[in-house]
Amino acid sequence: NLGPALLAGGKVAFTSNRNGFAPPKGYTSPTLQLFVMDEDGSNVTQIAPMNVSSALHPTPLADGRILFSSHESQGLRDARMWGVCAIWPDGRRWEPIVSAFHDGQAFHFATQLSDGDVVVEDYYNLNNNGFGAFFRLPLRPPPGEPRFFSAFPEDNPAIDQTVGAGFPYPFTMPFTPRGFRAITPFTTPNDEAAPVGAGGVRVGKVTHPSAAPGGDLLLAWTPGPANDLNRPQPTPYYDSGIYLMPDGGPVTSPSQLVLLKNDPAYNEAWPRAVVKYRDVHGVDEPVELPWLPNDGTVHPSLPAGTAYGLVGTSSFYKRESFPGHVTSWSDFFDGLDSFNT
């Protein structure tokens, strides 16, 4: 049982491998799934049976939803990819917040700032040891606009980063959320050493974003390459400390971070503001969303205690092989369509 998070109404969300499942594609094991229970440990309920691969770190949102990282290895995707989703505490209204589309990409570790924006981390899933770059986004798009840009990368806005060679190299990805922007553009989430900064010193990478009062952001930052491989070098090794990013960023250099604690004898991580929820979010607790009663009153065909049912149609209207095009290395349809092969 991992990652407990306090919800409104005396509930606690957490992840657990108690079902003993293994991910369909392996690589990330075991399968952790989302559960909610009362704060005294009673009424344990699995709320996300769609977590057949894995889920991590539920985080309460002020509007009552739960933010969490979801292992996204479906279909033809790379087995290391994680996205960030939201769900109601009773398991309804599961929806994407930001999805991964680059090989080895993990959107993981998230928090909600005082103004309602969310900060997520992007890192390469393996050699970066959880260190990468931060991105900020609103939970709702501007009025009258869709939440996400196009499925085609070239129709998406450029996102700032600085690559290991030390120069800016913005990237694009499909379905970029509206308002998605870098708040640590001085570094990169990629599988390479952090960029060289002033005086030939590598600028390092960040991890573990956590909201603080007044719109500030706590984080862990390490100088150096923050990558295990010789790309071009792995040393000096990690020396993580706790820092504060004023106003939730952006910052264009690690020198703009405010040092809180960095003992060279230790790696400090997982900062948390030890304050009341109101001090960060302006309310005493998140909205308490209604719980699906499941008491037999919704429909005669659904008696009390009816098991969850999942309905999925995305593979029909937005499948990975668009009509008339199949990725060259995965063309196994012999001239037929993916649904009549």
Listing of model-derived features with the role each one plays in the protein:
Residues 203, 276-340:
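Surface beta-strand/loop "capping" patches
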Residues 1-11, 52-67, 102-117, 156-161, ...:
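Conserved beta-propeller blade repeats
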Residues 1-2, 8, 15-34, 48-55, ...:
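A flexible loop/linker signature enriched in serine peptidases of the S9 family
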Residues 1, 44-45, 94, 98-102, ...:
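Surface-exposed loop and turn segments in beta-propeller and other repeat-based domains
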Residues 236, 240-243, 248-289:
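Blade-level signature of beta-propeller repeat domains, shared across WD40, Kelch, NHL, RCC1
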Residues 12-17, 66-71, 117-122, 217-221, ...:
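Residue position within the beta-strands of beta-propeller blades
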Residues 72, 91, 110-115, 122, ...:
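Carbohydrate-active catalytic/glycan-binding domains of CAZyme proteins
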Residues 200-249:
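Extracellular low-complexity, Gly/Ser/Thr-rich intrinsically disordered linkers
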